[in-house]
Each structure stands twice: as structure tokens, then as C-alpha cells.
Amino acid sequence: MKKVFIQVPATSANCGPGFDTLGLACNLYNEVSYEITDRKGFQLEVEGEGADYLKPFGRNLAFASFLRVWNSVTCGQRIGLKVKMLNRIPMSRGLGSSSSAIVAGLFAANALCDDYYTKDELLGIATEIEGHPDNVAPALYGGFTISYMEQEKAHSLRLLPAKPLKFIAVVPDSKLLTSLSRQAIPKTVPHKDAVYNTSRASLLVGALLSGNYEYLGMALEDKLHQPYRAHLIPGLPDVFAAAKEAGAYNAIISGAGSTVMAYASPEADCERIAKAMVDVFAANNEHACYHILDLDTEGVKKI
């Protein structure tokens, strides 16, 4: 029998102005084991997020992505497969739960196939499954990633900030489906808004690489997606304001939401920032919890 243990990080896409382009990995992890067994069929054990409804069939990304690599390398060799998941990444909250499942499955199958594919090749497969690379890239590589498509092929550049940052992820109880969140975004935007975001995304990368974090307050601003999604997250403008008033550089919608993520200095009072944001959600009849996180710099790995 063959078995592999995988750790895969949560991710936060967009990072404010970098819609469908920028992403980061943080130190909140799902742990998954994949075991090839003599017993036919698929078995699944889940602890934590999704334990009450994840099944080993249908659209289960952890199985489907595993089989995508396994079948391509082994020419469809039939196997029994047992998967055990310890899920800490909240589902449908904008922290990359689907990307973590995709990347875990691809990486596990690849490990059991003697690393047949490179990570860059896995990025291409993951993007085909997910539809865009901004979450799967940081899950694979760790750090901050800048992703782009060229001739229908995904590419990503990993970078590490010059100085540490803290990320305060405030997670409302209410889920927000990516499909619904995407429907809120118009198909066209004013040219001036596109220019606005280009300048902010460029400033964000420059601030991270140079360590000039005083620019993050402005660099994390956005006009391409967050204004159109704001009505889907109760009290969002006030949550942003509370984060900044409590000492964060700024706050953004993490991925498609509903999580709101504040960026802060390690010297900031992150508990104060988190509680200020939680209090605003509570004032809008929305319970929320929070995680104070660091950047993950490794991405998916065997443990």
C-alpha cells in the first residue's frame, strides 16, 4: 500500500486591487492523507470543516483532482482510495477551501507517482480545474503570488515581502458562494477605475518588496470588485473603517468573501483590530470569529 500525508495552506486572493491576479498563503492549514488500498472504491473520513456534508463522490474536489493526475500518469489504473481530512480552512468564506482541496489532491497523486509533474505543471492543471490561478498559485508555492494567463496557460511569480506582516482574518458565520459573488461584478468598468487599480496593485507590490508599508493603506484600495460586492457582506464599509481605526494598515475582502482580512504590522495590537471588526459584524446581526495569521512561505508540502 502507498500513503502520503499532505499539508496545504489557506489562501487569500485578490489582496485588494489585484483581482484574479494576486494571492497569498497563510498559516491556517488543512491536513490530508491519501492511501491507496486493496479495497475497491473510495472512502472518506472528515474532521472539522465540512464533516457533516462532504462525500467521496460527486463534485468532491479532493478525489477528482487526485484522479486527474493519477489517471493521466497511470493510464487509468483502477485503485481503492482512502482519504482522511482534518479541515481547518472555513468553507465558502474566501479563504481558498476549494483551491486547498484541488492542490492537495494533485500534489498527493503526484507524490505517489514519483513527482511526475513539476509544480509549474501542477499549476496549469489546478487552474484548469479551478478556472483561475489566484488561489491555487499561493496554495502551491506559498508567499505572495502574481499570476497571469498567457495563451491559455497559467504562470505565477512568487515573492516574499521585505518585512513580516500580520493578517487578521475575520470570518462571518454566513457563507458566500463564489458564483454569487462573481455575479455582482459588472462585465465592464470605467477606464479610470482600471487605471486606479493598476496604480494600486503596482504600489502594493512595490510596498511589499521595499518594506515601505506606510503605503499599504492606499495600496490595498480597490474599485474593480469590492464596491460591487459590498452589499453581500453586512456592514462592510464600517468593518474596513474599524480595522484601520484599531491600527491596521487597511482591510480587504478575502477572495470572494465573506471573510474580511486586515493587514497589520507585527507591532500592532492584532487582538484589538480583530475584536473591533467582530464588533461591527455583531452590530449588523452577523456573528464572526477571527484568526490572527502569518504568511505561509512554503505552500503545499508532505508532512
Model segments located where?
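Alpha/beta catalytic cores of group-transfer enzymes, especially the acyltransferase/condensing modules
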Residues: Y117-P164, A251, G257
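Short beta-strand-to-turn element immediately C-terminal to the catalytic PLP-Schiff-base lysine
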Residues: E35, A139-Y141, T145-E150, M261-S265, ...
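Glycine-rich, charge-dense phosphate/pyrophosphate-binding loop(s)
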Residues: L208-I303
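DPxDG-like acidic metal-binding loop motif
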Residues: L28, L95-K119, L140-G142, E150
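ATP-binding N-lobe of GHMP and related small-molecule kinases
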Residues: M1-R93, A111, D115-Y117, L295-E298, ...
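Solvent-exposed alpha-helices and their adjacent loops that cap or buttress functional pockets
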Residues: N14, G23-C26, C75-G76, I129-E130, ...
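FAD-binding core of FAD-dependent oxidoreductases
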Residues: S12-N14, G18-A25, S92-I102, E130-T145
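Acyltransferase
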Residues: P164-A241, E245
